[in-house]
């Protein structure tokens, strides 16, 4: 209610609530930098955030880092939307670092789709500083895909080429350890593979398939010979 009132948002609060919850999530695979503090159940890796509590039971506020990224000094120079004579939110924000690279973005639009993988904020900052110092491109630090708290591996299996325009592809692997001949302990899942979904997948593998009618008939034939 407060946010929609002061931002001139007229499209219903359901999508607004979902956006706020998503910006506060901090489990592995959500945000590298969550701009809001999650006070309550904002979702976990069990269901990829779908297990967040109802909006009326959770609370949030700006995180400590948010105002360091979206500088207060910029407020006076931003262009603001005029909503029926009331100045509301800015037409766009100007963060100190590109947040689309920090937290990534995935979705569809009219005639296009996007899938930007998250990257390491510290490497992004180092790269920006190198650009400001006019360091040659070859001497600038690399920016690698990064998911805060992820213990698995991320490997580039199709390096991007500036000349051919090929897209980079990354293979994300979890980790496991063999503890016995018939026992494996999974210690990390690939990002985007949520715990409950993977548990359901494993349980299906453990199910003994029911014998088909054809197999039953074959068994009867062998027994009668």
Protein language model regions, located:
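Catalytic phosphate-handling regions of large nucleic-acid enzymes and associated NTPases
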Residues: 1-167, 216-218
């Amino acid at each position: 209610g407060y946010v929609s009132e002061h931002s001139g948002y007229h499209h219903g609060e359901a999508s607004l609530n979902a956006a706020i919850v998503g910006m506060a999530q901090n489990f592995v695979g959500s945000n590298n930098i969550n701009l809001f503090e999650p006070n309550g159940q904002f979702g976990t890796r069990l269901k990829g955030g779908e297990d967040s509590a109802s909006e009326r039971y959770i609370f949030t506020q700006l995180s400590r880092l948010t105002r360091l990224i979206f500088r207060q000094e910029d407020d006076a120079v931003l262009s603001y939307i005029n909503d029926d004579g009331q100045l509301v939110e800015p037409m766009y924000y100007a963060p100190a670092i590109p947040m689309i690279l920090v937290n990534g973005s995935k979705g569809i639009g009219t005639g296009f789709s996007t899938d930007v993988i998250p990257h390491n904020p510290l490497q992004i900052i180092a790269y920006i500083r190198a650009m400001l110092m006019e360091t040659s491109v070859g001497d600038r630090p690399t920016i690698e895909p990064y998911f805060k708290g992820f213990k698995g591996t991320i490997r580039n299996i199709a390096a991007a080429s500036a000349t051919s325009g090929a897209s980079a592809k990354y293979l994300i692997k979890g980790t496991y350890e063999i503890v016995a001949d018939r026992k494996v302990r999974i210690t990390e899942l690939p990002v985007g593979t949520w715990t409950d979904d993977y548990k359901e997948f494993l349980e299906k593998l453990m199910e003994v398939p029911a014998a088909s009618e054809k197999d039953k008939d074959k068994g009867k034939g062998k027994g009668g010979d």
